[in-house]
Amino acid sequence: MYPDKDVIHQFLSLLTEPWKECSPKGQLDLRFLANGKSASTAQFSDDQLMDATDHIVQLNINKLNAYVCINPVAEKPLKAGKGAKDEDILRAHFAFADCDEPGSAERLKSSALPHDFSVVTGTRPHLRCHYYWQFDQPLQNLAKWSVIQAGFAKAYGSDSCVK
């Protein structure tokens, strides 16, 4: 499987579009992982989406999986190899369900409220998707966001670590 640059850019654009209405806008926090390798991280502002896209593509080609923090993080230096922590998150613009377990993607798609967009993260050995719902207004109460995320995990069998 080869990374699709256009799809990656579209995904990053969808995530960061609502940030433009907020102050501070924040930045993207990216993490890259692979078995037997140290974690790698990178941060990009919303006006550096092509740079972020190119970075993701290059590291995917080098067999690292990319993980994007869907919420904007504070614009501050982070320790090398360390991604943003909960206290670095500025606010939430989306709820999402990480459906990587067998049957969870199909279960959510057939019974949840319509999602705003989704990303297929794999098809073998089974369908794996992430589903996204945009809030009408940014959610400042991140404890409430965690409750929403836990609700998705319980109802649909999505990843319970996403909170």
Task: Tell where the protein language model's regions lie, with residue ranges.
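Flexible helix-coil linker/hinge segments at domain or subdomain boundaries
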Residues: A150-K163
